[in-house]
Amino acid sequence: MKKCSVILAAVMAAALCAPAVSQIAAQAAEDAPVVGFWSTEEGVTERPIADGTTETYAESDRKWQGLPTIAVTPGGRMWCAWQTGDAIEGSEGPNNYDVMYYSDDNGKTWSNEYMIWDVPDDSVRLADPRLFYDQFGKLWLVLIRGGLKGAYAVEMKNPDCEDPARNLETGEPISWMKAPPAHRPTILSNGYWITPVEVDTDAQQTYICRPDNDAGKYPWTTTTSQPAVTAYPDNKTFGEAQIVELSDGSLMMLSRLPRDCGGGMEISYSYDYGTSWTPYKADNGVPYISPSSKFHIQRLESGAILMITHATTADREQLAAYLSYDDGKTYPYMLMLDDTDIRGSWRDFGVSYPEAAAQQGENGEIYIVYDAGRYGLKEIRMCVVTEEDIKAGKPVTQYCRMREQISKLGGYLDYVDTSEDYERYITVQPGTEKSAILAQLPASVTLIGEDGSQLPLTGEWECLDYAKNIEGRYTFEFSGKVTGKAQDLYSLLKVYVTVAAEKEEPSDPSDPSDPGTPEKPSDPADQKDNGWIIGVSVGGAAIVLCALVAAVIVIRKKHSASRKK
């Protein structure tokens, strides 16, 4: 049985009970390029998969999720879509599809009704959805069909409607372009749309659209006078490029570089609205120090350029937001969005593939979505920040919200405690050897899950940049490999060491009012810590420990998945 037939049967059944199916013209056609329908966890649809068996679209059958996109409607509703499925995303295989949820409370909770987009052909998949508002006020959902097989677009005609599962109207999927875009199009000041695409695994090309809204035509054409085709080096097969318009009307295009090219990004400029481009020039300076991962760049309402990328070349961690007020020449402001450490398996992918909504909130809020641990944590997360937060380098406004869950799949436990008694904050005198610090830390750590289960780990503590004679704060991390199983694992397995000259020995360590008691370290991860140990001497070196007395360190889960009823 074809997948389309199975889907249509489920759609007919769903029409008899809540939620009703949206008015999607394409789902009635056997040859539809994509089909869409609404579902819930209580009424999921079976689907055939490549090995001849069946599964459902339920969250419990999804093996991974990632690559989110977000848009905010004029009425304030948020729509968020991402790719998921049963197949391993990295294999570019079939059986992956797109899902779309909505929120009516500024992203605090998300609907338990969701929209499924899939393809009738079992041999291909849907990938990398993109939500895109054009200058005419139309909201588009762009769906990439099967790797390099092109893209389709669906217009969401009334995205602010009441009860979307019953009342959302969508247009028939139209062929968007023959090559897949990695980002939503950039709308230029002349009204044109422009996007870089992957022509094949060896080259990139620029597509330009001059939309005719009155005629309902949105033709994409490649540049003709000087085709903007860039031949990739031998060890670069794709770039996921994105374009931003500068204040003088010129265009800046950025493209990711693989690690064996040195990491970072390539930069090219156009001075004729994308008809021709300068040769790419590599840059791995801040903020272009990418670990070969997708980034996001856009111009904000203030005119500033927002860049979201990683603050390291080492791995897909330390996701940060940067601001430039001089057209990308410098980025003096940075806010760390998510420094979750999800190492241990390359398939965890860290925190990656960010996107910011093109629409800002009424208070200047910037809505940023990304994935966290595609195969371990299996989370879609959101940060809400303002320019003031980014310029301050920390949350300073009442609107700032960090690392919130939009969706989390099951399959792994959240580990919230550790049974070992070790100090998380240590202050040492300059000259203290690393070995004196390591001697105080356990060689094994047992993690405790929310259900009481235990996971013993054996490993070593390490800090590669520790310099005993240089004052500052250093992070020691436990090397026991856990493949992204815990949202707060990165906090549980870190010790923060401050090298600082001791000014004065406390006269009474047990008296918290004594002026000699060191101030408790200010760290968001330690907000629930209680208790102190002062004045411990190890190996002849004076080490002042500021840490927990309790035998169990408790870092509670910061967010739990929430579904709007």
At which residue positions do the language-model features occur?
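Bacterial N-terminal signal peptides
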Residues: 9-19
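Sec-dependent signal peptide cleavage junction
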Residues: 17-30, 531-532, 551-558
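Asp-box/BNR beta-propeller blade signature and adjacent active/binding-site loops
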Residues: 30-410
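Solvent-exposed, low-complexity, repeat-rich "mucin-like" stalks and linkers
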Residues: 407-453
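Serine/threonine-rich, repeat-prone extracellular segments and beta-strand-based repeat modules
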Residues: 451-499
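C-terminal low-complexity, Ser/Thr- and acidic/Pro-rich disordered "stalk" regions positioned immediately N-terminal
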Residues: 501-531
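Single-pass type I membrane protein transmembrane segment
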Residues: 533-544
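C-terminal membrane-anchoring or membrane-association module
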Residues: 545-565
